[in-house]
Amino acid sequence: MAVKHKVVSLPRLNRLSPTLESTALKLMEEAGELAQAIGKLRGLSGEVCYEDTRAVMEKVTRELLDVAQTAVSMMFVLEEDYGINIEAALEEHIRKLRAKGYLSL
């Protein structure tokens, strides 16, 4: 079976001056908003969800893309401010997934 890929190409935000710390905090904030959207659908907050599933899934999608954008912003910070090679790190990440048995190529 061929391995599927989901390619997400998001821009470097050019009207912000992110730092490692500010981006990490923003990532946690966005992840919290994603969890909140999922929790609302599942009734985990104790309140009844009156929105239809499609509307909630669209909100979950928007929040997930906010998480992805912030993660990409952090990648730019790591590359530009700390000299990290994200491509090499990605290759190592794939090797790790294979070693753990999460992925076979």
What is the predicted function of each stretch?
Residues M1-L105:
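Flexible "arm" and connector segments at domain edges
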